[in-house]
Amino acid sequence: MILPSMYVFPDPPEADPEGQGLICIGADLEPSTLFEAYTHGLFPWFNEGDPICWWSPEPRCVIYPEQYQPSKTLIRSMKKYDYQITMNRAFEKVIRSCALPRNYTNETWISEDIVQGYVELFKAGYAYSVEVWENDQLIGGLYGVNIGKGCFGESMFSLRTDTSKIAFYTLMLIGQENQVPWVDCQLVNDHLISLGACTLSRQAYLKSLQDVIIQPPINWKRYQERVFSSKRIAQNAKLTE
């Protein structure tokens, strides 16, 4: 259960009429604050040691699960290696793996405060993870926030070729099976565009957001008690019968 937040976030278009994206600075990363932020179209993004910055970009990057098509290369990889895929089994391991330095930089925006805030949000039932395993080793995954039918992607990681893409494809199938209209990808980048993402105006995103967050949430229990095979997913293009 999420208690009411002690913070009130400003309306993004009023706080940022020029569309620069930064809405406000401050507050904390308690679950109630994160919940309040996401339901108003904001997310935290800041460097470790800096004040907490809350963003609502113009435009907003989203991807539509119903329109997503995995690449032929990804399908071949899923059939070749047959990894195991789970949901909500190792949320903290996933977010900590996402926080590790990448090959191209030693910096990370996923601070210990971010980790603790989202772990608590997960415990409250408003965050999710998708894990990719090779036997007992976690080799890829992603995490995000889920409120109603609102699905918000946060970060992903990969220790083997394509394992973050396998997690992403799995999330798209979850979205298809639960009538999730879009997955919020926040900021536009070339990698997301290559996966099929597109942009919405901030106004259109905020209007849609208010509709989706009041819808029945994703039924994660139907997935998290099972272990899925990447080979079977690639063959069937679905998770449940």
Curated annotation (Swiss-Prot):
GO terms for biological process: protein catabolic process. It catalyses: N-terminal L-lysyl-[protein] + L-leucyl-tRNA(Leu) = N-terminal L-leucyl-L-lysyl-[protein] + tRNA(Leu) + H(+); N-terminal L-arginyl-[protein] + L-leucyl-tRNA(Leu) = N-terminal L-leucyl-L-arginyl-[protein] + tRNA(Leu) + H(+); L-phenylalanyl-tRNA(Phe) + an N-terminal L-alpha-aminoacyl-[protein] = an N-terminal L-phenylalanyl-L-alpha-aminoacyl-[protein] + tRNA(Phe). It comes from the Bacteria. GO terms for molecular function: leucyl-tRNA--protein transferase activity. GO terms for cellular component: cytoplasm. It holds the Pfam family Leu_Phe_trans. InterPro entries: Acyl_CoA_acyltransferase (IPR016181), Leu/Phe-tRNA_Trfase (IPR004616), Leu/Phe-tRNA_Trfase_C (IPR042203), Leu/Phe-tRNA_Trfase_N (IPR042221). Its EC number is 2.3.2.6. It is found in: Cytoplasm. Keywords: Acyltransferase, Cytoplasm, Transferase. It is an enzyme of class 2 (transferase). The keyword Magnesium does not apply. Functions in the N-end rule pathway of protein degradation where it conjugates Leu, Phe and, less efficiently, Met from aminoacyl-tRNAs to the N-termini of proteins containing an N-terminal arginine or lysine. Belongs to the L/F-transferase family. This is Leucyl/phenylalanyl-tRNA--protein transferase. It comes from Acinetobacter baylyi (strain ATCC 33305 / BD413 / ADP1). The lineage of its organism: Bacteria, Pseudomonadati, Pseudomonadota, Gammaproteobacteria, Moraxellales. The gene is aat.
